[in-house]
Swiss-Prot record:
This is Apolipoprotein A-II. The gene is APOA2. Plasma. GO terms for biological process: cellular response to lipoprotein particle stimulus; cholesterol efflux; cholesterol homeostasis; cholesterol metabolic process; cholesterol transport; diacylglycerol catabolic process; high-density lipoprotein particle assembly; high-density lipoprotein particle clearance. Belongs to the apolipoprotein A2 family. It comes from Canis lupus familiaris. It is found in: Secreted. It holds the Pfam family ApoA-II.
Length: 100
């Protein structure tokens, strides 16, 4: 019986000490994680700026914007015309009851 009690006591002490050691283990510092994240973002931004300095990327971007502008200009003009027609219909509806 004493042997069983001593065994249980040793197991409890070992498990408690193991939990104590786990609590003392160093947790990753939030500040270091955030600074590491910002450093990674900064490095990525620098790499991106170096790549953007190349003339071929600038030419591709310019061509893309010109193509987009060519495609969007007619759509914007049509949307403006449709909006004016829509608003003029509202103005016509408001003036009709007054004339009757």
């Amino acid at each position: 019986m004493k042997l069983l009690a001593v065994t249980v006591l040793l197991l409890v002490i070992c498990s408690l000490e193991g939990a104590f050691v786990r609590r003392q283990a160093e947790e990753p510092n939030l500040q270091s994680l955030v600074s590491q994240y910002f450093q990674t973002v900064t490095d990525y931004g620098k790499d991106l700026m170096e790549k953007a300095k190349g003339p071929e990327l600038q030419a591709q971007a310019k061509a893309y914007f010109e193509k987009t502008q060519e495609q969007l200009t007619p759509l914007v003009k049509k949307a403006g015309t449709d909006l004016l027609n829509f608003l003029s219909n509202f103005m016509d509806l408001k003036t009709q009851p007054a004339t009757q």
